[in-house]
Regions:
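Outer-membrane beta-barrel "beta-signal"
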Residues: 183-194, 332-336, 341, 360-373
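C-terminal hydrophobic structural anchor segments
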Residues: 294-343
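Detector for outer-membrane/organellar transmembrane beta-barrel domains
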Residues: 178, 188-192, 196-314
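Extracytoplasmic loops and strand-loop junctions of Gram-negative outer membrane beta-barrel proteins
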Residues: 8-9, 38-40, 126-131, 200, ...
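Outer membrane beta-barrel
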Residues: 11-171, 176-193, 215, 289-313
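Gram-negative outer-membrane beta-barrel domains
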Residues: 257-260, 264, 333, 342, ...
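Outer-membrane beta-barrel biogenesis signature
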Residues: 1-25, 193-213, 226, 337-341
């Protein structure tokens, strides 16, 4: 009998004896409540929602070298209709040809490999959400061609090179009358060898690296004739305008015996970031820096601290509404079954220098339960 294999954190797997196909089904949900307060600590906003509810299918068909991955999102956070009216349920739908463990090529829709924080799954975070820097500059997903090369030499020096050519308007856009395309490349260096159990895409040092492990990475993306304000995301540019956008990223990770340190630097450049002033539309030219550190106690309790800062260029500051936005976050996570079942809480303090709106929220307190199969 071809019985399914069930393992928490690894889904339900079906694989016939003939091995001509395999199917792994997974789901996860994040239930979150959040409170926001002004400078006088007066409650201004309450969030209570299923933030993420995802269903994922992975496996191979015909040959183990032909691999597929599908992911669907079902909450309002995931499915908000796109500016062109298209539905936004499909997150990943891609087929890979994997001739060897060293390299693969893919065709379809998936994450664009640019910055580390966005490449990490939202199920593998040590805070309830990614940083404000990632929220502004990440490239999210796109449809197109993807390629990856992984040099593997045991404990010694390793590297990975990743690239893609995608439709520059992001996931589920469908078609573009402009004809623009986004070109993205990323290089990852592992001078002391690779992390245990793909620890470079899991926040914190859950595996407890016995030797110091380091990742140095950089990426660049050129979005030719982008029609959305953030390239793959954001509103449509006014009056059918387009802009050429450049996005750049640098990452550093260090892990050792429960201690983890991350830093991300990223930014966006555009020669003409402004439009008709009456539209209030603009391309966020600027940079951001994120630094976070954590320590894990006995694979159960983790404490983490993060500091994130956004620096808009002077010409877009009147539209961004501030000269600088700094957010400091302290988080606590209780791991029950790794990242598959965990409880998280964090508190953030926001400070915006020369803010146009003096009544912005200063404090945020959030609690979240995550369960995944």
């Amino acid at each position: 009998r071809n019985m399914p294999n069930l393992e928490v954190g690894k889904g339900i797997t079906f694989r016939p004896k003939s091995n001509w196909f395999s199917l792994t089904m997974r789901f996860r949900m994040q239930n979150m409540v959040g409170l926001s307060f002004d400078k006088d600590f007066t409650l201004t906003k309450t969030d209570a929602q299923v933030k993420r509810l995802r269903l994922r299918f992975d496996g191979h068909i015909y040959s183990p070298k032909l691999v597929y991955s599908i992911q669907l999102g079902f909450t309002s956070y995931d499915t908000e209709p796109l500016p062109n009216g298209n539905m936004n349920i499909v997150r990943d739908a891609i087929v890979y040809y994997v001739p060897s463990p060293k390299w693969n090529i893919g065709f379809g829709q998936t994450k664009i490999k640019a910055n580390r924080a966005r490449t990490n799954s939202s199920s593998a975070l040590q805070f309830i959400d990614r940083s404000i820097v990632n929220s502004e500059f990440n490239l999210d997903r796109g449809f197109g061609f993807f390629g990856e090369y992984n040099m593997r030499q045991g404990e010694g020096f390793n590297l990975s090179a990743k690239g893609s050519v995608t439709l520059g308007e992001g996931r589920n856009w469908g078609s573009s009358a402009i004809g623009g395309v986004a070109y993205t490349g990323r290089l990852e260096l592992y001078p002391l060898g690779r992390f245990k159990s793909k620890g470079d895409v899991l926040e914190g040092d859950f595996e407890g690296e016995e030797r110091v492990k380091i990742l140095l990475a950089g990426a660049y993306s050129y979005n030719h004739k982008a029609s959305r304000l953030k390239g793959q995301r954001g509103a449509v540019m006014p009056d059918d305008a387009t802009r050429n956008l450049g996005s750049y990223f640098a990452d550093f990770i260090l892990k050792y015996r429960g201690f983890a340190f991350y830093t991300d630097f990223m930014g966006r450049s555009c020669d003409e970031p402004l439009f008709d002033p009456r539209s209030n539309a603009f391309v966020y030219n600027g940079q951001g820096l994120n630094v976070q550190t954590s320590y894990l106690f006995d694979k159960k309790w983790e404490i983490a601290l993060r500091n994130s800062t956004l620096f808009p260029e002077s010409e877009v500051q009147p539209f961004a509404g501030y000269k600088r936005w700094n957010q400091t976050t302290f988080g606590v996570t209780r791991y029950i079954i790794g990242h598959s079942l965990k409880v998280q809480a964090d508190m953030s303090y926001n400070h915006r220098s020369e803010s146009i709106d003096p009544n912005y929220n200063r404090w945020e307190i959030r609690f979240q339960l995550e369960l995944g199969l």
